[in-house]
Amino acid sequence: MTNKNFYNALKAEKERLMNESKQASRDCQIKHGEMSKAWNIINALESLDKFGTQELSNAYDNYEEASHASMLADNYLDDIDEAIDKINELMSLYTD
């Protein structure tokens, strides 16, 4: 593979990752919203003195699940951004 072909392959992969990053960012926003909603339900149940109920227990389980999903979405977005940074570093070798 020639240097020009390699550079073009890097450029194409960067473009693909940039599009993936946009979707991952939207997914993060959705997951953060789900986590916030789950926490608001917990607050509402606690304000109604629903302590020790199955309903509150389920709400905490839902929050834990939403929190985990949010963390995974954040990690995925971070991984994409890191890959883009590495591609930018490689591409800079060809422009210097």
Named regions from a protein language model:
Residues 27-59:
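Extended alpha-helical coiled-coil "stalk/arm" regions
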Residues 20-27, 51-95:
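Amphipathic alpha-helical coiled-coil segments
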Residues 3, 34, 76-80:
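Intrinsic-disorder-associated interaction segments
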